[in-house]
Amino acid sequence: RPKVLAEAQSAARSNDDEKLRRYVFEAMRFDPLAPGLPRVALEDVILARGTWHETSIKAGAQVLAAFASAMMDPRRVANPTTFDPNRPASDYMHFGFGLHECFGRHINRATLHMMLKPILKRENIRRAPGPNGRLRKNGPFAERLVVEFD
């Protein structure tokens, strides 16, 4: 998305940290660090009772609170496939939600965009050629991506 990259670079170069933060969080919505958080059901429960996808979960079963899919669910997020850095903060569930929200959320909100800012200020930023320019992951976690700039 060259247009989105150019807009993020413009925010970085003009020191518009709030705008840059919004671009970073919106980009992370499309490819979050982790797909969700594992949890253990404390009691038997039936989800979606009375619907065609009713599911029974037994106490002690492992479940995944899949916030990655929730952030792309049109019942939860308006126009989920559209890149929109002006979304309400409630659309972002990268760090969980509610009582089980990661306490690192606030640190990340304050620092993630600042770590990317010096890179985004560079001219002609691009992926390195060949395999180094492809995002390498270890499971859902980004491991390496080499970029070049002038």
What does each model-found stretch correspond to?
Residues 1-150:
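Cytochrome P450
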